[in-house]
């Protein structure tokens, strides 16, 4: 069971974007892509076959999953734990103990 899932609101705890918040767009084995975080400029060639123009585009790159933490109700970073309730595994915030939706 992954501790961070698509759609979770996270905060960056280390790196150049430390303190910024965003919503998880994609989750990989060890990396997460967060909306508006870790933007890089990518130079794109024009491609008339696809109908794209060339130029410089901002692209969101993945972050390591250890560099982000979930945001609790108080707006602070929280670690995530996993416990069994009624025979099912559920995620909970370690700071508040609040159970996250399945």
Swiss-Prot record:
* Entry similarity comment: Belongs to the universal ribosomal protein uL24 family.
Quaternary structure (record): Part of the 50S ribosomal subunit.
One GO CC term, this protein: ribosome
Q: What does this protein do?
A: One of two assembly initiator proteins, it binds directly to the 5'-end of the 23S rRNA, where it nucleates assembly of the 50S subunit.
The regions listed as transmembrane in this protein's record are none
User: Is Ribonucleoprotein tagged as a keyword?
Assistant: yes
Alphabetized, the UniProt keywords read: Ribonucleoprotein, Ribosomal protein, RNA-binding, rRNA-binding
| Origin organism lineage | Bacteria, Pseudomonadati, Pseudomonadota, Betaproteobacteria, Burkholderiales
Listed Pfam families = ribosomal_L24
Q: What is this protein called?
A: Large ribosomal subunit protein uL24
